[in-house]
Swiss-Prot record:
Stored SMART domains: REC (SM00448), Trans_reg_C (SM00862)
High-level lineage: Bacteria, Bacillati, Bacillota, Bacilli, Bacillales
Source organism: Bacillus subtilis (strain 168)
The protein, known as: Transcriptional regulatory protein ResD
One Pfam family matching this protein: Trans_reg_C
Major location category of this protein: cytoplasm
Length: 240
């Protein structure tokens, strides 16, 4: 699959009829579709191939979608949409904490899936595939950290940092208003665009992952994301 220039999507679900349905609608949009029928196969394919997006069922026998997401996130920033059933809100929260970018509730409209896929691919393409040599002006520059918003490119001490679309959006939202404190509810509303009635720990988990990624490149850059105890988070210009 990696030998084509097509947009490649991995569809993961233990139900063959759902895989067929999603394949049919997504191929109409000229996406190249690959399938996995269980979590272990999804992990193997997700780590070996370079997919542009993964549609991932949450509840599967054996290795579930949360574990699949967690293992892929350890190695890659591939955009992931979780497919969940009604009544699985607690598991959806775990999915966000594991690193999923969005979720769709079953039973779903195939057209909604296509729209969500297009929206996430659009954000991901801005983050991952923009030509970094294109001149841009919308750049936030701080000591040890710069954020080129037009290119969706983050560098810490001169080294590019690979972030998921949601991690990037969270960092940029905080950094564009330095020293302003945001509570978790505000961050959920502004960064997670879709309706979400989940656990506020989702924000904490994304902040933790963001700090870890920055810290691997520049501990000074990671310190700029500051916890305001009992309130929320802020981006502190002078923090080093």
């Amino acid at each position: 699959m990696d030998q084509t220039n097509e947009t490649k999507i991995l569809v993961v679900d233990d139900e063959a009829r759902i895989r067929r349905l999603l394949r049919m609608y997504l191929e109409r949009e000229n996406y190249a579709i690959d399938e996995a029928e269980n979590g272990d196969e999804a992990i193997a394919k997700g780590l070996e191939a370079n997919y542009d997006l993964i549609l991932l069922d949450l509840m599967m026998p054996g290795t579930d979608g949360i574990e699949v997401c967690r293992q892929i996130r350890e190695k890659k920033a591939t955009p992931i949409i979780m497919l969940t059933a009604k009544g699985e809100e607690a598991n959806r929260v775990q999915g966000f904490e594991a690193g999923t970018d969005d979720y769709i509730v079953k039973p779903f409209s195939p057209r909604e899936v296509v729209l969500r896929v297009k929206a996430l691919l659009r954000r991901a393409s801005q983050t991952s595939y923009f030509n970094a040599n294109t001149p841009t002006k919308n750049v936030l520059v701080f000591s040890h950290l710069s954020i080129d918003h037009d290119a969706h490119r983050v560098t810490a001490d001169g080294t590019e940092v690979s972030l998921t679309p949601k991690e990037y959006e969270l960092l940029y939202f905080l950094a564009k208003t330095p020293d302003k404190v945001y509570d978790r509810e505000k961050l959920l509303k502004e960064v997670w665009q879709y309706e979400f009635f989940g656990d506020l720990r989702t924000v904490d988990t994304h902040v933790k992952r963001l700090r870890e990624k920055l810290n691997k490149v520049s501990p000074e850059a990671a310190k700029k994301i500051v916890t305001v105890w009992g309130v929320g988070y802020k981006f502190e210009v002078g923090a080093e």
